[in-house]
């Protein structure tokens, strides 16, 4: 299987399955000398891990990360960093009924057609459990970018199902299981997700992720534009079906004289482009939004076929998120951090000696 790595100079490779022994990652390209402990990674893993609220999957995994290489006496050595998370709460028997059938809306059918075989336990490699390693690797990137440049990467949920958050208070985001910055929207989110679980169905979600204080100049036109790589990274997250940069799809109804992000000697007058111009960071806040589809793992029976290509019905058992967007915020933050870290290293490799004609304007 190809496609298990992302990045060029900051390169993350993951492996492992939902019900296997564990999850692993190799993170290459981390500069030497970064103070790094397992606790630095655990903070974000704890934000993502399952079983933390009644609004997410009840699979209880501690997701304790182990650093097995690349760190000596508390600092990175510049060699590949090996990471390991052991699985502890697999219940593979819950998936015995789908060994011969395909769950609609999942990768079961396509994996079987492509590889001729699949690990049906919890979705195997296609499970969102794989994203735990992305979060661990992304935490390394977030720490380096924060210490080196003061970059702040953070996200919040703006919509669950048909319920929309109207306000954003960053102080509220860590205070609820939805990563929502609108305290008034939280009870509506709770009621909706509770109702969905009782009905045996699920819903989608929308998230916004911001990267503040990103220096101007990161991005490699034309095929490796910063926004192109961000979109690629976000689309690699399970269930993501849409990505917006800046104003996103709203630009279809906008006019050039309103949205061209005029600039003066004192700074930019707007940020409709989302902090990226010509595929290169402008120094403004990078704004990304993603839409996640409803999980197809629901307790309502659905039509499918079996390995004999016969029509049948399937009822998905197991422990699943009624809304996958609830735990997606730290995953999206991690993917944005990984892309930014990679582009910093690439920019430094070619352009470290470039002297612009004037200092960057205020974002």
Swiss-Prot record:
Family that this chain belongs to: Belongs to the chorismate synthase family.
Function statement: This reaction introduces a second double bond into the aromatic ring system.
Gene Ontology biological process terms from the UniProt entry: amino acid biosynthetic process; aromatic amino acid family biosynthetic process; chorismate biosynthetic process
Keywords, ordered alphabetically: Amino-acid biosynthesis, Aromatic amino acid biosynthesis, FAD, Flavoprotein, FMN, Lyase, NADP
Residues bound to NADP(+): 48
Parts forming coiled coils: none
Pathway: Metabolic intermediate biosynthesis; chorismate biosynthesis; chorismate from D-erythrose 4-phosphate and phosphoenolpyruvate: step 7/7
Annotated Gene3D superfamilies: Chorismate synthase AroC (3.60.150.10)
Keyword RNA-binding: no
Cofactors required: FMNH2
Record's keyword annotation contains Flavoprotein: yes
InterPro entries in alphabetical order: Chorismate_synth, Chorismate_synth_AroC_sf, Chorismate_synthase_CS
Subunit structure: Homotetramer.
UniProt-annotated binding residues for FMN: 125-127, 238-239, 278, 293-297, 319
Cystine pairings recorded for this chain: none
A GO term from the CC aspect: cytosol
Gene Ontology molecular-function annotations: chorismate synthase activity; FMN binding
Name listed for the protein in its UniProt record: Chorismate synthase
Cofactor stoichiometry and binding remark: Reduced FMN (FMNH(2)).
Reactions listed under catalytic activity: 5-O-(1-carboxyvinyl)-3-phosphoshikimate = chorismate + phosphate
EC number(s) per entry: 4.2.3.5
């Amino acid at each position: 299987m190809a496609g298990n790595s992302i990045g060029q100079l900051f390169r993350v490779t993951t492996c492992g399955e939902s019900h296997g022994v564990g999850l692993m990652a190799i993170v290459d390209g981390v500069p030497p000398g970064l103070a790094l402990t397992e606790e630095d990674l655990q903070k974000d893993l704890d934000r993502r891990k399952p079983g933390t609220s009644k609004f997410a999957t009840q699979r209880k995994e501690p997701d304790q990360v182990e650093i097995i290489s690349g760190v000596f006496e508390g600092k990175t050595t510049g060699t590949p960093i090996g990471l390991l998370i052991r699985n502890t709460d697999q219940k593979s028997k819950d998936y015995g009924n789908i060994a011969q059938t395909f769950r609609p809306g999942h990768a079961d059918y396509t994996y079987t057609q492509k590889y001729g075989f699949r690990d049906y336990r919890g979705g195997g490699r296609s499970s969102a459990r794989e994203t735990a390693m992305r979060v661990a690797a992304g935490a390394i990137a977030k720490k380096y970018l924060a210490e080196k440049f003061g970059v702040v990467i953070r996200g919040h949920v703006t919509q669950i199902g048909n319920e929309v958050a109207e306000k954003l208070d960053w102080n509220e985001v860590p205070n609820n299981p939805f990563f929502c910055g609108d305290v008034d929207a939280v009870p509506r989110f709770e009621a909706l997700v509770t109702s969905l679980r009782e009905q045996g169905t699920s819903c989608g979600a929308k998230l916004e992720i911001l990267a503040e204080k990103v220096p101007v100049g990161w991005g490699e036109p034309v095929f490796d534009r910063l926004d192109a790589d961000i979109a690629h990274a976000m689309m690699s997250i399970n269930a993501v079906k849409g990505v917006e940069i800046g104003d996103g799809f709203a630009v279809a109804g906008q006019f050039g004289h309103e949205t061209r992000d005029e600039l003066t000697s004192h700074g930019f007058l707007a940020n409709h482009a989302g902090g990226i111009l010509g595929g290169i960071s402008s120094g403004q806040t990078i704004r990304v939004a993603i839409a996640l589809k409803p999980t197809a793992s629901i307790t309502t029976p659905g039509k499918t076929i079996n390995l004999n290509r016969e029509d049948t019905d399937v009822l998905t058992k197991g422990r699943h998120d009624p809304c996958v967007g609830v735990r997606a915020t730290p995953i999206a933050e991690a993917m944005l951090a990984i892309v930014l870290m990679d582009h910093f290293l690439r920019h430094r490799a070619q352009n470290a000696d470039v002297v612009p004609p004037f200092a960057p304007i205020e974002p």
